[in-house]
Amino acid sequence: MRILFVAAEAAPIAKVGGMGDVVGALPKVLRKMGHDVRIFLPYYGFLPDKMEIPKDPIWKGYAMFQDFTVHEAVLPGTDVPLYLFGHPAFTPRRIYSGDDEDWRFTLFSNGAAEFCWNYWKPDIIHCHDWHTGMIPVWMNQSPDITTVFTIHNLAYQGPWRWYLDKITWCPWYMQGHNTMAAAVQFADRVNTVSPTYAEQIKTPAYGEKIEGLLSFISGKLSGIVNGIDTEVYDPANDKYIAQTFTADTLDKRKANKIALQEEVGLEVNSNAFLIGMVTRLVEQKGLDLVIQMLDRFMAYTDAQFVLLGTGDRYYETQMWQLASRYPGRMATYLLYNDALSRRIYAGTDAFLMPSRFEPCGISQMMALRYGSIPIVRRTGGLVDTVSHHDPINEAGTGYCFDRYEPLDLFTCMIRAWEGFRYKPQWQELQKRGMSQDFSWYKSAKEYDKLYRSMYGLPDPEETQPELILTNQ
């Protein structure tokens, strides 16, 4: 099939959040499966510093009384064709900045629609988040082009109809929706980035005021868990960690713990229970729970803690002050560094992720990949990727709790701290986690099924002829 991914982000050249990871990784796997997948992305002013882009455009268009160009390149490190939407509104900017984002991304969406109508006609346009929400509305009049809309962040829903009427063409059937709700209604298929989150957003607690609409269209709503690049993030070959290792050579992993303790200024002690956290410091990630509980946990145990991330100033200050109370046992790094994050995954014993809500989550999968046991709240994608440790039946991959309460988090962390004492069981838990398949190939197979379902095509894995052996 001919599939065009339209999005505001695509790793590794333009990434802020998880959407960039999906758009940067999924197309190259789908191409290996036989699909002709391409990406349509804004031509941000910083892109020439990150990749080679031909000077001359391949096409010129007109949308919302604006001229624009389209340049063709290749996504670095892949064979995926990349179309760059050129307009002065995107040239001097970061990905998200300024007060005119609603106008900029509506123009971008309009340009993508014109491109599909007039230059490269796909079978499917795969749209991502509100920035591309108008495309399913416009394509509703093009029955030969179908649309998939993926919700990465339901909290940001884009401009409303009253504003859109002022800047672009809004079909009469769009009614009074914002762009997110309009996309949900008119896309041929809608998905989120985990099955559990797909169910949760149909409730008032998670639906961001459009839970009624999401329930109404539940027949075309599904959830597909994101993946991670298991070739890039591989503890057996990672050049950023002190000692490479596998599930069969877990004893080597201790060198990463000692190296991490030395790097971040913790007391070097391979027997100390070391917890890591790599996160945005925002309420969604459970920072209010951590602040209420961590002081008590550190006082009650001999554990160590290392934090990497940035976010709200309040949470940054609180975590910094908390670290100052436990010198040699707690380290706080208010920044983001990919290499250090890998060393935290590879060197910690457990990884803390007590999210209030979590559409999918990548960090828990990275932690499992590197042998760090997740401590998570059962919500969204965390339910679909981490199962609670059951030592009797030798099952599970982490420690889980349900209620969003400090005491519940404290109790769960104490259980993990106590479980760490039993080294043989702990290593078996690590091995189960490291054996999980979080590759993009697994996710791509689910998207392939989704695309095929839109055209009534069978799943190739279910239509393989059965081999029957007979005696001659």
From Swiss-Prot:
UniProt entry tagged with the keyword Transcription: no
InterPro entries membership: Glyco_trans_1 (IPR001296), GS/SS (IPR011835), Starch_synth_cat_dom (IPR013534)
UniProt family annotation: Belongs to the glycosyltransferase 1 family. Bacterial/plant glycogen synthase subfamily.
Keywords: Glycogen biosynthesis, Glycosyltransferase, Transferase
Pfam families membership: Glyco_transf_5, Glycos_transf_1
Function, in words: Synthesizes alpha-1,4-glucan chains using ADP-glucose.
Classification via CDD domains: GT5_Glycogen_synthase_DULL1-like
NCBIfam families noted in UniProt: glgA (TIGR02095), PRK00654.1-3 (NF001900)
Residues the record lists as binding ADP-alpha-D-glucose: K15
Catalytic reactions of this protein: [(1->4)-alpha-D-glucosyl](n) + ADP-alpha-D-glucose = [(1->4)-alpha-D-glucosyl](n+1) + ADP + H(+)
Record pathway: Glycan biosynthesis; glycogen biosynthesis
Top class in the EC scheme: transferase
Organism lineage: Bacteria, Bacillati, Cyanobacteriota, Cyanophyceae, Nostocales
Entry superkingdom: Bacteria
EC number(s) on file: 2.4.1.21
Gene3D superfamilies tied to this protein: Glycogen Phosphorylase B (3.40.50.2000)
UniProt GO MF annotations: alpha-1,4-glucan glucosyltransferase (ADP-glucose donor) activity; alpha-1,4-glucan glucosyltransferase (UDP-glucose donor) activity
Signal peptide residues on this chain, from the entry's feature table: none
Organism: Nostoc sp. (strain PCC 7120 / SAG 25.82 / UTEX 2576)
Protein's name according to its UniProt entry: Glycogen synthase 1
Gene Ontology biological-process entries: glycogen biosynthetic process
